[in-house]
Curated annotation (Swiss-Prot):
Aminoacyl-tRNA synthetase in keyword set: yes
Enzymatic class: ligase
Subcellular location: Cytoplasm
Family according to the record: Belongs to the class-I aminoacyl-tRNA synthetase family.
Annotated SMART domains: Arg_tRNA_synt_N, DALR_1
GO CC field: cytoplasm
HAMAP family: Arg_tRNA_synth
Designated name of the protein: Arginine--tRNA ligase
Coiled-coil blocks: none
């Protein structure tokens, strides 16, 4: 019996009790919540449903809790139901009911924990979207990990997710990039507003390999040659790095296409139709302050050139016209102003601002030997995705970046995350999976297979804790998806790994020496099989490997 099953039982029981006592059944909340008490001595689960209902239906909370508890004790799978405090209901499950989660996990396999919670949604998930002027830096790497994990997480809940990279190939930064390449190719100093670093020299040399006469071309043609080839080379490197990191995209949208295909003009025309565009001081303005932004925004500047927001407007409209009912943007710490701006853009088009969600990620700091590792893209000392992977590996890099809420700055201790110790969270979780895999191999050598026919034998305290944690997985995924918080998967896996290690230390799974195998051994093997499956499922959502051996 999962927490969701128990919640449904509690709701149906409470409904029957209210009816029996001629009380208002409509007072019941849409969802009845059961929680695991902090003190296991209070039971397996607890609910405050009686406290929620009492005032609404005019009943004494303890008396109402008593009625519900008495009815619950007659239900299949409930070992006891007791009233505590002002009206809490503490519940204990029968072992056989609790252990049914093992069957559910084994039957569902890699699909365990999936639901149709978001089946009605077509989601555009835009993340990373770094300028093609340099390698992916550590901040962008955080989004590469978190964004990919969020996409996987939403997919487990039935959402149709498209991962999209907005390719910023329009604007002044691309011109500065091209000028930096030209200076490097000529052996000249980097322009004051340019990009520096060995990667600039490398790309400049590769441009000359592809276009040996580039430096002898007229200035405009030379600039365009370095711009076009340089951007293509840089972005190829970005995509390759992301792929090796385990992050791939379904769609790459070029910012330049928003301008070259007339999408910006179409967006402005659409806004004129809604009356949310006006002219002032020779410029074209969006009435964004009417929709929650702190001020109106210039869309077309007085010189006739589109402002940056023009591309954003066209891009949002493009997404909506492609059928996305939810557009999630994952942006850096310096983009807080974009939350109101993008929601205002949606409202200006006559769309629901709720179709736009903006997640803001905080800074990532690397620490080596207790000292921060500095980064500066323009100074050429940028810490890149490739650097992080080289230092601690793909799995540790992804896990370390996903593990904390995105609105929290994080420090990544390179020594910790590269260590083979229980203090390293990803090692701790992966070791649990490897340990379970070794156990399965050893069982096979003994001719033992998991057996779910006698799960009622799983009555040890540590077995009960492990079963309840396994049962939490589907609900945790729903919560993590609803809140857009994949870090919850990491924290759950660490709890599950800890519960498994403690179970393993207390409960012998395989017979020793000449000991005859028993039904308890094979029931514990089934519990281990289920635990291994859930760990693999969770790591899969994170894009982290589940090793068979370590």
């Amino acid at each position: 019996m999962t927490p969701a099953d128990l919640a449904e039982l509690l709701k149906s029981t409470a409904t029957a009790v209210l009816s029996e006592h001629a009380l208002d059944t409509s007072a019941l909340p849409q969802t009845v919540v059961v929680e695991r008490p902090r003190n296991p001595e209070h039971g397996d689960y607890a609910s405050n449903v009686a406290l929620q209902l009492a005032k609404k239906v005019g009943a004494n909370p303890r008396e109402l809790a008593g009625w519900i508890a008495e009815a619950l004790t007659k239900a299949d799978g409930i070992a006891s139901a007791e009233v505590a405090g002002p009206g809490f209901i503490n519940l204990r499950l029968e072992t056989s009911a609790q252990a049914k989660i093992v069957n559910a996990i084994i039957d569902a396999g890699s699909g365990f924990g999936h639901s149709e919670l978001m089946a009605a949604h077509k989601v555009n998930l835009e993340f990373v979207s770094a300028n093609p002027t340099g390698p992916i830096h550590i901040g962008g790497t955080r989004w590469a990990a978190v964004g990919d994990a969020l996409g996987r997480l939403l997919s487990t809940q039935g959402a149709d997710v498209v991962r999209e990279y907005y390719f910023n190939d329009h604007g002044a930064q691309i011109d500065r990039f091209a000028n930096s390449l030209i200076a490097a190719a000529k052996g000249e100093p980097t322009p004051d507003d340019g990009y520096a670093g060995t990667y600039i020299n490398d790309i400049a040399a590769r441009v000359l390999q592809k276009a040996p006469d580039a430096l002898s071309l007229p200035d405009a043609q030379m600039h365009e040659t370095f711009r076009e080839i340089g951007v293509d080379l840089m972005f190829s490197h970005i995509k390759e790095s992301l792929h090796e990191f385990g992050t791939d995209f379904d769609v790459y949208t070029h910012e330049d296409s928003m301008h070259s295909t007339g999408r910006v003009d179409q967006a402005v025309a659409r806004l004129r139709e809604t009356g949310n565009i006006y002219e002032k001081d020779g410029a074209t303005w969006l009435r964004s302050s009417s929709f929650g932004d702190d001020k109106d925004r210039v869309v077309i500047k007085s010189d006739g050139k589109p402002a940056y927001i023009a591309g954003d407007l066209a891009y949002y409209l493009d997404k909506r016209e492609r059928g996305f009912d939810l557009c999630i943007y994952m942006l850096g710490a310096d983009h807080h102003g974009y939350i109101a701006r993008l929601k205002a853009a949606a409202a200006a088009f006559g769309e629901d601002p709720a179709t736009v969600e903006v997640l803001i990620g905080q800074m990532v700091n690397l620490v080596r030997d207790g000292q921060p590792v500095r980064m500066s893209k323009r100074a050429g000392t940028v810490i890149t995705l490739d650097d992080l992977v080289e230092a601690i590996g793909v799995d540790a890099a992804r896990y370390s970046l996903i593990r904390s809420s995105v609105d929290t700055p994080i420090d990544i201790d390179l020594a910790l995350w590269s260590s083979a110790s229980n203090e390293n969270p990803v090692y701790y979780v992966q070791y649990a999976h490897a340990r379970l895999s070794a156990l399965a191999r050893n069982a096979a050598e003994l001719g033992l297979i998991p057996d779910t026919d006698h799960l009622e034998l799983l009555s040890h305290e540590k077995e009960g804790v492990l079963l309840r944690t396994l049962g939490d997985f589907p609900r945790m995924l729903k919560t993590a998806a609803s809140l857009r918080e994949p870090h919850r998967v990491c924290r759950y896996l660490e709890d599950l790994a800890g519960d498994y290690h403690r179970f393993y230390d207390s409960c012998r799974v395989l017979p020793q020496g000449d000991e005859e195998p028993t039904q308890l051994h094979t029931a514990r093997l089934a519990l281990c099989q289920a635990t291994r499956q859930v760990i693999a499922n969770g790591l899969g959502i994170l894009g982290v490997t589940a090793p068979e051996r370590m």
